[in-house]
From Swiss-Prot:
It comes from the Eukaryota. Coiled coil: none annotated. Residues 1139-1149 have a biased composition (Basic residues). One of its GO terms (biological process) is cGMP metabolic process. Residues 1147-1149 form a propeptide. The gene is Pde6. The modification Cysteine methyl ester is found at residue 1146. This is cGMP-specific 3',5'-cyclic phosphodiesterase. Residues 278-430, 462-643 form the GAF domain. Its EC number is 3.1.4.35. SMART domains: GAF, HDc. CDD domains: HDc. It comes from Drosophila yakuba (Fruit fly). It holds the Pfam family GAF. It catalyses: 3',5'-cyclic GMP + H2O = GMP + H(+).
Length: 1149
């Protein structure tokens, strides 16, 4: 059964909409009763009735109901949220709607949700109970009784929801309604779409809108959004002006204004223009309202334009009557643009003097121009012209009204005063409208510039599309007829000096440019090669490559050439006169059609002119303004960015192609030859013991180059990596040979160093039993990383790369060389026939490459210092499980550092030779820093401070090596030999450092060729002519005669750390250390030769001295300079007790 709607003119009416049987039930019942019935039902309703005069409305809202829920067996006015606050909001909106109704409206409604009997599912329908309509003769008490009886006939479910005197629904009622809404939401939706009355829908819409967050009130927000959302044609008209644009509707909508007095009319007309922000609509309203206030027949409004030095008036609207439609007025003003300079005519004089002009008889005034009357046939009698100023008193326009319509022949003082007062408010409105128009234009400009910025990235591979898009946007925004872009030949700009000489063989070979030819020379360098031209709105862009003759004959091209040469922006109002004033422009074509030109250079990031942008002729025939120039400058900047970005992109593509070619060539030459690979494949590989691979004392000094490769293969075999990961044997051999080939022949960081690092890792894994903590894949990655960790090393460190700003330092900002080593490793693996990981699964490949990368980067000592504290913390906490990803990475990093510096733990005869290689490489880098950077290198790289190397070796061991090996051997005791070897070498370096500090032991060679032990440790061997110098020990004492011994050489006595060969004095600290060294040397049977020599010289000197000798005073402690040889040593062996001589020596020291 379809719902029926019954309406009556009585004071009480009800609306009944019933649901069909078995169909969707109606969740809302709206009962419209009389005002007295609504008042009585308030006690039984869930909300208080709202009153508005004679109308009273009761709204019952079931809390907890949402608009999308299914209806339940209850009573609700409108589905709402569970809080009473929403009900209050709804009542507030309803009160507002009642207040907005006209007086005398007698519509009151009571909204309830009820279920008819017999519907167990809780569905409800909109119905009108019998007897609810009351006649006008019924008393309020009778109507109240009938209303109460109607409520009492509801079902028990309805009574649970509507209870008096409760103002809110119970939670049980809410649950029942919510349950029904959740079970049957489609029933509620169907009722809303098919059977809900318009009044219920409107109230529901108000309730939904009320729940939305309110926007901040703004006078211009809605208009601005509507303006920007409209099309460009609609933007030219105000949205609110369209309804008032017809000539017939304007008098109708203003007819009620005639009933207002003058004050009310004035205020009403002010309100009419107060919030109007469309400049066209505002000017139209001003003229119509002024005509209404002053009884003027028609009026015109002029707006001030131009620069401060060249101002003029432009007719915004002209000859507007009260019946003139806005569209007609705007069209006529646009078609016949009237421009009046300041000081010309009536309006021009008012604008210049800011004084009002009231003319009673226009034809008798010399300033009046009667040409308009002759064209239109209209006769002008009286004119009232008045300036429009802003709040600062500046002229922003002029308003002019003509002829009275009330029978008067002139404008009296009353008209003048009303006109002046109204224009005061109009000045504020006009300036606001202009500011709003400027904001809209600025918004559009910003949107265009954002689109241009987006286009730069989208069209970076297509220069023609990018320039065409920029030109199109510039033409549309600046309203010009044509637009052109000239691009400079950049290859010509970057031509070498030799090419210029070849082009001009008759010119002298000099870089100097004659002043007379400077402009022509610049023109040659800024030669245009590409021209983009864009004509009218429906014309496509034209791209051409003009010839030299075409550029020379074109005036526009010559002007563009002038801009490119000078780098200046030109804004030309009269092209013919400008060309006449510039003699450099020698064009042949006609320029009659060209009126105005705006030409601007396009520059790249280096401020080089790469093109010229040119605008030709404004659409309205006026010159380009400063505002146009500023906007066009933004287009030129974006055009320059786009062109520069496109060229950079092209260059990057070329460089990438070159890089690919270079990598192919490098890969070919970096790969081992097939002959070498076949030879190594067929060679027999000795056992690991024959190479001493399991020992931490391994040395490669006795191995030839081929043996080093065989030793590497043996390590892979012993770790079972070849069969485990199915590495083809020929691929492994080729990879080993390729790795060896890619190491440079530097003194230390070469292939031999990589072999030693890999062997130490192998010994740690096998002998040190570290393999139990590693997987086979990690062992493979660690060995590969050890062999590749210094690939392509240049003999310089990261600091040198940064100082010299090398390409590697630019490519890698941190761990420069280590990243390069890893990249070289990847390059070799990617070379044909060198991928030893080819049989791995993708997951295993990623895992092993991650291990290799992390291990190689860990060889940077900066990374070691970052990881060391975390590793020490784990060890101190007793960590024994190293299988976590982070912990395994820390352990591998420490192992890589331990292997990288393992030369410090080799036997002393190996260690000091390796130290010589390291020192040589460091000294070479120091020499490069002095030569290339003109800086003083650090001590360990300064060849002049090579005597400090033993001391620096001790510091290196103390800071890096010993702490690392100590913590490793404490955790993994099987690698203790590394710690013990380092400790032994530290003692040797410390002993050498002390002797060097005393000056007793240093061989004057460029490198550490022979340690002092080689000539001082063998007491049994015969000493052959070793020159030894003993200087004065008590050097500060003078003889009694005030002069030094004649045998004492002259020397500088201030230094205490100079060698004895160079000086004749020892400081107190040096004598103390020397005494300590001598005592330490007395270990029993075989004192060192140096000690024997010193004792021999001292005993001979003491035996030769006599206490009474006149030539040697007793007070003098001087000792002569003597040369020690083998014969002297043997001949000087007098029968002197050895302990006695030692005691005398110690006494002297």
């Amino acid at each position: 059964m379809h719902g029926t709607v019954s309406r009556s003119s009585s004071s009480s009416n009800m609306t009944d909409v019933s649901s069909p049987a078995g169909g969707a039930a109606s969740p809302v019942e709206i009962a419209t009763s009389s005002s007295t019935a609504a008042t009585t039902s308030a006690s039984a309703s869930s909300s208080k009735p709202l009153t508005n005069g004679a109308n009273k409305t009761a709204i019952s809202t079931a809390a907890g109901v949402t608009p999308g829920a299914a209806p339940g067996p209850g009573c609700a006015a409108i589905p709402a949220s569970g809080s009473s606050g929403n009900q209050v909001k709804l009542e507030h909106h309803y009160r507002q709607s009642n207040n907005n109704r006209p007086a005398g409206s007698n519509r009151s409604s009571e909204t309830k949700l009820r279920s008819p009997a017999g519907e167990s599912d809780g569905a409800s329908r909109l119905m009108t109970p019998a007897g609810s309509s009351s006649s006008p003769s019924q008393s309020p008490s009778q109507s109240q009784s009938q209303s109460q009886a109607s409520i009492q006939t509801q079902t028990s479910q309805q009574d649970r929801l509507v209870k008096a005197p409760s103002t809110t629904a119970s939670q049980q009622d809410v649950d029942e309604v919510a349950r029904l809404f959740e079970e049957k939401p489609e029933a509620f939706e169907k009722w809303l779409t098919e059977r809900a009355p318009p009044e219920a829908l409107s109230r529901l819409q108000e309730f939904i809108e009320n729940r939305k967050p309110h926007k901040r009130p703004s006078v211009t927000s809605d208009l601005f959004q509507q303006w920007m959302a409209a099309s460009p044609t609609v933007q030219q008209k105000s949205p609110r002006s369209l309804s008032n644009s017809s000539a017939s509707s304007l008098p109708e909508c203003r007819r009620h204004l005639m009933d207002l007095d003058e004050g009310e009319l004035f205020m009403e007309l002010i309100r009419d223009v107060a919030n109007e922000l469309d400049i066209d609509v505002l000017c139209h309203k001003i003229l119509v309202n002024v005509g209404l206030l002053t009884h003027a027949d028609r009026g015109s409004l002029f707006l001030a334009k131009g620069t401060p030095t060249n101002k003029y008036l432009v007719a915004k609207l002209f000859d507007v009557t009260q019946k003139t439609a806005l569209k007609d007025a705007v069209t006529r003003a646009s078609a016949e643009e009237i421009i009046i300079p300041f000081g010309i005519g009536i309006a021009g004089m008012v604008a210049q003097t800011k004084q009002m002009i009231n003319i009673k008889e226009a034809y008798k005034d010399a300033r009046f121009n009667c040409e308009i009357d002759l064209k239109t046939g209209y006769k002008t009698n009286a004119i009232l012209c008045m300036p429009i100023c802003n709040y600062e008193g500046d002229i922003i326009g002029v308003a002019q009204i003509i002829n009275k319509t009330n029978g008067c022949m002139e404008f009296d003082e009353h008209d003048v005063e009303i006109f002046r007062r109204y224009l005061t408010f109009c000045g504020i409105g006009i300036q606001n409208a202009q500011l709003f128009e400027m904001s809209v234009q600025e918004y559009r400009r910003n949107q265009i510039l954002l689109n241009l910025a987006r286009s730069i990235f989208e069209e970076q591979n297509n220069l023609e599309c990018l320039v065409t898009k920029i030109m199109t946007e510039a033409r549309e925004l600046l309203k010009c007829e044509r637009c052109s872009v000239f691009l400079v030949d950049l290859d010509c700009c970057e031509a070498s000096h030799l090419e210029k000489i070849i082009e001009k063989p008759n010119q002298p070979a000099t870089r100097a440019i004659k002043s007379a030819d400077s402009f022509e020379e610049k023109k040659m360098r800024n030669r245009f090669t590409v021209l983009f031209e864009l004509g009218g709105e429906y014309q496509a862009a034209n791209v051409s490559r003009p010839s030299v003759s075409e550029l020379s004959s074109s005036t526009l091209a010559q002007i563009a050439q002038f801009v490119a040469t000078t780098g200046q922006t030109v804004n030309i109002c009269d092209v013919i006169e400008w060309v006449r004033d510039h003699n450099q422009i020698r064009a042949e074509d006609e320029i009659d059609s060209t009126q105005a030109i705006l030409c601007m250079p396009i520059m790249n990031a280096q401020k080089k002119v790469i093109g010229v942008a040119q605008l030709i002729n404004k659409a309205n025939g006026v010159p380009f303004t400063e505002s146009d120039a500023s906007i066009f400058e933004a287009f030129a900047i974006f055009c320059g960015l786009g062109i520069h970005n496109t060229q950079m992109y092209e260059n990057a593509c070329k460089l990438m192609a070159k890089q690919k070619v270079a990598l192919e060539c490098l890969s070919y030459h970096a790969t081992a030859s097939q002959d070498q690979t076949e030879k190594l494949t067929q060679d027999a590989i000795a056992e690991a013991e024959s190479y001493n691979l399991y020992s931490f004392t391994f040395t490669d000094f006795e191995l030839v180059d081929d043996d080093t490769c065989r030793a590497v293969l043996r390590m892979f075999m012993q770790c079972n990596l070849v069969s485990q990961f199915q590495i083809p044997y020929d691929v492994l051999c080729r990879w080993v040979l390729s790795v060896r080939k890619n190491y440079r022949p530097v003194k230390y960081h070469n292939w031999r160093h990589a072999l030693n690092v890999a062997q130490t890792m192998f010994a740690m894994l096998k002998t040190g039993k570290m393999e139990r903590f590693m997987t086979d894949l990690e062992i493979l990655g660690l060995l590969v990383a050890c062999l590749c960790h210094d690939l392509d090393h240049r003999g310089t460190n990261n600091a040198f790369q940064t100082k010299t700003e090398s390409p590697l330092a630019i490519l890698y900002t941190t761990s420069t060389m280590e990243h390069h080593h890893f990249d070289q490793c990847v390059m070799i693996l990617n070379s044909e026939g060198n991928n030893i990981f080819q049989a791995l699964s993708p997951e295993d490949y990623r895992s092993v490459m991650k291990t290799v990368e992390s291990a190689i980067l860990s060889t940077d000592l900066a990374m070691y210092f970052k990881k060391r504290n975390a590793f020490l913390e784990l060890v101190e906490n007793g960590e024994f499980d190293w299988q976590g990803e982070e912990k395994k990475d820390l352990l591998c990093g420490m192992m890589m550092t331990a292997c990288d510096v393992s030369a410090i733990a080799k036997p002393w005869e190996v260690q000091h030779k390796v130290a010589k290689l390291v020192a040589d490489e460091f000294f070479d880098q120091g020499d490069l820093e002095k030569l290339q950077l003109n800086t003083q290198p650090v001590a360990m790289m300064d060849r002049e401070r090579k005597d400090e190397l033993p001391k620096m070796q001790v510091g290196f061991i103390d800071v890096i090596c010993l702490p690392l090996y100590r913590v490793l051997c404490d955790t993994f005791p099987w690698i203790t030999p590394l710690y013990e070897g380092t400790l032994e070498n530290r003692r040797n370096w410390q002993d050498l450092a002390e002797k060097v500090e005393m000056g007793l032991t240093w061989i004057d060679h460029d490198t550490i060729d022979k340690p002092v032990e080689e000539f001082a440790a063998c007491a049994d061997e015969e000493i052959k002519d070793i020159e030894f110098t003993v200087t004065t020990l008590n050097c500060n004492q003078q003889s009694q005669h005030g002069s030094e011994d004649s045998h004492t050489p002259e020397h500088q006595r201030s230094g205490s750390r100079l060698s004895m060969k160079k000086t004749g004095a020892l400081g107190k600290a040096v004598r103390s250390k020397l005494s300590k060294t001598l005592y330490n040397s007395m270990d029993g049977s075989k004192p060192k030769t140096s000690l024997k020599l010193l004792e021999s010289h001292v005993s001979e000197d003491m035996d030769d001295k006599s206490p009474t000798s006149p030539s040697q005073p007793q007070a003098s402690g001087s000792m002569g300079r003597m040369s020690a040889s083998s014969s002297t040593s043997s001949a000087g062996g007098q029968m002197v007790d050895k302990s006695k001589k030692r005691s005398k020596l110690c006494a002297l020291l």
